[in-house]
Amino acid sequence: MNLFVLMKRTFDTEEKIVIETGKIQDDGAEWIINPYDEYAIEEAIQLKEKHGGTITAVTVGGEEAEKELRTALAMGCDQAVLINIEDDLDEPDQYSISQVLYHYMKDQEFDLILGGNVAIDGGSGQVAPRLAELLDIPCITTITKLEINGTDAEAERDVEGDVEKIKTTLPLLVTAQQGLNEPRYPSLPGIMKAKKKPLEELELDDLDLDEEDAEPKLKTIERFLPPKKEAGKLLQGEPAEQAKELVSLLRSEAKVI
């Protein structure tokens, strides 16, 4: 099987986030593989172990993403591709990234493309479905189980707590939801082997893609942190009195009714 994994380098949202002049200050930030993409990587590795094949990890970004690609190689991917847009696109959006990926993937032979359900830094979940639409292939999002039998595929996907079962055929694009598997940690031998595995760097010119054709369609007006949570209030008295006070607070302070 020819397996491709869409991977994104993100900052760890568990760390403190600083916003200045409308931009996230990433100096000193901890950068990681998007956690949902780790599920995709692990699923690709398990499929390769079962069916054989080659796994290619692909990311769009700057040169700094090489570190995360090497981590993917250490986990078990066979090769990696960095599509460097650092000097070409300023603040690319989901349209931009999907266009870049499409111009790369359309020339590749693939059976299955895997990606994370969402990126923890943006959370739109748009890139993979957009790419599938451009490639004109089936797309199943938020999968929690995947079985491949020849050119047939069966998947279970999370639907707000329920499960939906879907059958389709390859080639296919899927996005991974938490619970699909338990991503492995890179082993020491894996880390050593990753240093020698091929990592190709491409630019838009290599894809015959003009900057104008991948210009973002969205413009960010403002970025801000959510308000700090205030201490809760403990309501006293009988249930009827508590209910009355709660309604009053919702109207006067929360202003939701």
UniProtKB/Swiss-Prot annotation:
UniProt key word Ribonucleoprotein: no
SMART domains, alphabetized: ETF
Transmembrane region(s): none
Keywords: Electron transport, FAD, Flavoprotein, Transport
Record note on cofactor: Binds 1 FAD per dimer.
Pfam families: ETF
Signal peptide (residue range): none
CDD domains noted in UniProt: ETF_beta (cd01714)
Gene3D superfamilies associated with the record: HUPs
One GO molecular-function entry: electron transfer activity
Entry cofactors: FAD; AMP
Protein family per UniProt: Belongs to the ETF beta-subunit/FixA family.
Biological function: The electron transfer flavoprotein serves as a specific electron acceptor for other dehydrogenases. It transfers the electrons to the main respiratory chain via ETF-ubiquinone oxidoreductase (ETF dehydrogenase).
Quaternary structure and interacting proteins, as annotated: Heterodimer of an alpha and a beta subunit.
Protein name: Electron transfer flavoprotein subunit beta
Gene source species: Bacillus subtilis (strain 168)
Highest classification ranks of the organism: Bacteria, Bacillati, Bacillota, Bacilli, Bacillales
